[in-house]
Curated annotation (Swiss-Prot):
Belongs to the ABC transporter superfamily. Signal peptide: none annotated. InterPro entries: AAA+_ATPase, ABC_transporter-like_ATP-bd, ABC_transporter-like_CS, Metal_Ion_Import_ABC, P-loop_NTPase. GO terms for cellular component: ATP-binding cassette (ABC) transporter complex. The lineage of its organism: Bacteria, Bacillati, Bacillota, Bacilli, Bacillales. This protein is probably a component of a manganese permease, a binding protein-dependent, ATP-driven transport system. Probably responsible for energy coupling to the transport system. This is Manganese transport system ATP-binding protein MntB. The gene is mntB. It is found in: Cell membrane. It comes from Listeria monocytogenes serovar 1/2a (strain ATCC BAA-679 / EGD-e). Keywords: ATP-binding, Cell membrane, Membrane, Nucleotide-binding, Transport. It comes from the Bacteria.
Length: 240
């Protein structure tokens, strides 16, 4: 996946400034940086969910939007209307819709895919619950299950571990590593850099501009972290 000269602005204020990099296929890549660095903006800009001032994102010489059916997106929980009357099962079943098109309805095959995904995240016992009744960790598992049901090749996750329990975080991380081991490409916006070395193969260190990008052991150094975070107090955690 190639990002070339990506610039994004809100109300004429630059949020992402001329970012160019390549994201390796079959890797777990983390987007890391201080608050306000543009991490979520970069993720959404890559997917074409928000307007770009300039730049392009391509995969195999085609715009990334061309591969939309092969891309799964897990948004921040705050972006989801938890009052919407949908059950856990139906939420996960939505993951099968991109492959169905506009007319075809989900059948036995799709329902089994949803059940299999719920089993992987250990949420089958909650399938009839309304999503607003779930805890943060349970809800995040459901979002992951929806992505699994899609059978995507590329997974974008925006702060999937924020405000969830450790059991859910460990389960989700195991699933992401399993997907990576099966050749999937995974990009995660992440805020807890104490776990960066344990979670990711590569990182994108960002503060509106690209600070560094590459394998964790080469990129996640004290010097580069301090450059990205500036005067903000940062406890160096590479290798933890």
């Amino acid at each position: 996946m190639e990002i070339q000269g990506l610039t994004i602005a809100y109300k004429q204020k630059v949020a992402i400034d001329n970012v160019t990099l390549q994201i390796a296929s079959g890797k777990l890549t983390g987007i890391v940086g201080p608050n306000g660095a543009g991490k979520s903006t970069l993720l959404k800009g890559m997917m074409g969910l928000i307007p770009r001032e300039q730049g392009q994102v391509t995969l195999a010489d085609k715009p990334l939007t061309y591969w939309r059916k092969k891309i799964a997106y897990v948004p921040q929980r705050s972006e989801v209307d938890l009052t919407f009357p949908i059950t856990v099962f139906d939420m996960v079943l939505l993951g099968t819709y991109p492959a169905l098109g506009l007319i075809k309805r989900p059948g036995k095959k799709e329902k089994q895919l949803a059940l299999d995904a719920l089993e992987q995240v250990e949420m089958t016992g909650f399938m009839k619950r309304q999503i607003g009744e779930l805890s943060g960790g349970q809800l995040q598992r459901v979002f992951i299950a929806r992505a699994l049901a899609q059978h995507a090749e590329i997974f974008f996750l925006d702060e999937p571990f924020a405000g969830i329990d450790m059991t859910s975080e460990a389960l989700i991380m195991r699933l992401l590593k399993k997907l990576r081991d099966n050749g999937k490409t995974i990009v995660v916006v992440h805020h807890d850099f104490h776990k960066v070395a344990a979670y990711f193969d590569d990182i994108i260190l960002l503060n509106k501009k690209l600070v560094a990008h590459g394998p964790v052991e080469q990129t996640f150094t004290e010097e580069k972290i301090q450059f990205a975070y500036g005067d903000a107090p940062v406890a160096f955690a590479a290798g933890v």
